[in-house]
């Protein structure tokens, strides 16, 4: 639960270019192409493992649907190519519930793609980065 107005939470979550300033695990975020309500965005983040940080990188098509209070991503480059992500924001008493749903069959690697996604890439990298991102969005939105 994020204890902030839903419009503020949506604004912080959608303002991806500011993420490196408010989320220490993001290396950079830049729009490669802007369109009304989103565009093509390149993102790079660190996945920390204690003192070691593993670099990650991907490009997504991003759509911000303010009416539905959703932010959708379709990963188009990087190891997570073809992954669909949706952030859903729902106003509830006392704040905003945010869910992040990732749908992905895994990389197109013969024999091991789905297994690698299920055992390593999803739980270790995707969940590791997404959970830190959501925690940082919460902290920033509640402070603003």
Which residues fall in each region the model found?
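Solvent-exposed residues in well-ordered beta-strands and their adjoining turns
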Residues: 1-5, 44-48, 63-65, 76, ...
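Amphipathic alpha-helical protein-protein interaction surfaces
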Residues: 15-18, 94, 130
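Well-ordered beta-strand positions in beta-sheet-rich domains
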Residues: 1, 55-61, 84-86
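Hydrophobic pocket/interface hotspot
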Residues: 9-13, 19, 62, 89, ...
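Beta-strand/loop substructures that line and gate deep hydrophobic ligand-binding cavities in soluble
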Residues: 74-127, 137
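Hydrophobic ligand-binding cavity/cleft-lining segments
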Residues: 1-40
